[in-house]
């Protein structure tokens, strides 16, 4: 899998910034996608999620949602990762995100950030909660989710 990710990365300068890959390390935490920490020789580090190509719509939806959430996040309290690229390569889809070091986070600060995120996004859309389009919760489709 690491070899496929390396080959996929060769097609995207957005992720690598012309730097060579130093190492690709699997990281845990999810049950739908495989997750990776990718280290580049220039010191840059990114988070990647990979799955089969038929799940690319889940990644497209996640990319869109993260982009919108980032507008509402108060970065003094909570960070929403920047989406770097979404690549299709052979039978693989890979979503590349900004790496966020979670070891430096405090739960009470994250809780306040999450509350502020909900507040500011609900003020933007007073009609209701949810999303304008069909989406996903995990691998399940979600109507206006």
Regions found by a protein language model. Name each.
Residues 1-20:
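Juxta-kinase regulatory segment immediately upstream of eukaryotic protein kinase catalytic domains
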Residues 25-145:
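ATP-binding pocket architecture of kinase catalytic cores
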């Amino acid at each position: 899998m690491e070899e496929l990710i390396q080959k996929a990365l060769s097609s995207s300068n957005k992720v690598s910034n012309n730097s060579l890959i130093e190492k690709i390390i699997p990281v845990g935490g999810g049950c739908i996608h495989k997750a990776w920490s990718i280290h580049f020789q220039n010191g840059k580090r990114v988070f990647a999620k990979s799955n089969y190509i038929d799940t690319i719509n889940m990644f497209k939806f996640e990319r869109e949602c993260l982009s919108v959430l980032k507008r509402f996040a108060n970065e003094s309290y909570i960070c929403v990762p920047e989406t770097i690229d979404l690549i299709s390569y052979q039978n693989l889809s890979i979503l590349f995100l900004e790496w966020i070091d979670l070891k430096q986070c405090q739960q009470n600060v994250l809780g306040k950030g999450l509350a502020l995120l909900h507040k500011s996004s609900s003020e933007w859309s007073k009609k209701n909660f949810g999303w304008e389009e069909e989406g996903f919760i995990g691998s399940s489709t979600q109507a206006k989710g």
